[in-house]
């Protein structure tokens, strides 16, 4: 799995070859820097800790700033760990950009949704409410009965856990799955996804390869160690071996 940290820029629209309008979201992903590498032997799991968004040093705690200075990195405001299968080509200080994703693949986006304050059950939980036509309603938008309150034989005089009631709406962790990558701007570190993502403009996001139907691409690193490509066999090393049942010239 490949993942990057980013920030929501805003929404726009694209048009396909048939002229159909496609709503898209623009996300600034990277440049991200590897601040730590977790291995199975040392930490018990495999992951890469990434840092994003350079800010002034006075905005960070001394503990975080000391760890970043030890790794010779700038003051990064956001640090997140991303579970992955292989970290062999990652090292502390490696730079990751938007070209880790390809056009046409699917990604999952995690973030915090927009808070909408204290809301009732009709808006928060899609309750139907009372009738709005005819003779009107006796209870309108109130939740109605929430359980037995008489306390008689066989009745529990309490509200069951999980009962839908009015309360805080939004401002919670949300994961939007399988969004298609429409465009990748590696120079400006921009990723264009089909559809919407949680949060308002400027909200931090985590973009990872989709768990369902996503590609398992290797990490593309800039400024870190990379695996050397395998050399193609030379013409001299290609020796034809006779197959069984064929005659060789003497």
Enumerate the language-model features and the residues they cover.
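Extended basic (Lys/Arg/His-rich) segments that typically form rRNA-contacting surfaces
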Residues: 1-250
């Amino acid at each position: 799995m490949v993942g990057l940290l980013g920030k929501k820029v805003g929404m726009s629209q694209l048009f396909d070859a048939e002229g159909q309008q496609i709503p898209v979201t623009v996300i600034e992903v990277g440049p991200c820097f590897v601040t730590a590498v977790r291995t199975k032997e040392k930490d018990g799991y495999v992951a890469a800790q990434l840092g994003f968004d350079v800010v002034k040093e006075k905005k960070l705690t001394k503990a975080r700033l000391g760890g970043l200075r030890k790794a010779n990195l700038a003051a990064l405001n956001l640090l997140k760990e991303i579970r992955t299968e292989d970290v062999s080509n990652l090292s502390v200080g490696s730079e990751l950009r938007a070209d880790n994703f390809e056009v046409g693949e699917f990604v999952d986006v995690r973030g915090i949704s927009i808070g909408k304050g204290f809301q009732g059950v009709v808006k928060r939980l899609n309750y139907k409410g009372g009738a709005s036509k005819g003779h009107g309603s006796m209870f309108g938008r109130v939740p109605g009965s929430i359980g037995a309150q008489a306390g008689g034989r066989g009745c529990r005089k309490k509200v069951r856990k999980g009962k839908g009631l009015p309360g805080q709406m939004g401002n919670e962790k949300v994961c939007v799955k399988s969004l298609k990558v429409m465009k990748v701007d590696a120079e400006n570190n921009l990723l264009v996804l089909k559809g919407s993502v949680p949060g308002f403009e400027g909200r931090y996001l985590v973009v990872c390869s989709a768990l369902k139907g996503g590609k398992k691409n290797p990490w593309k690193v800039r400024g870190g160690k990379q695996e050397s490509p395998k050399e193609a066999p030379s013409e001299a090393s290609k020796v034809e071996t006779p197959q069984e049942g064929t005659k060789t010239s003497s």
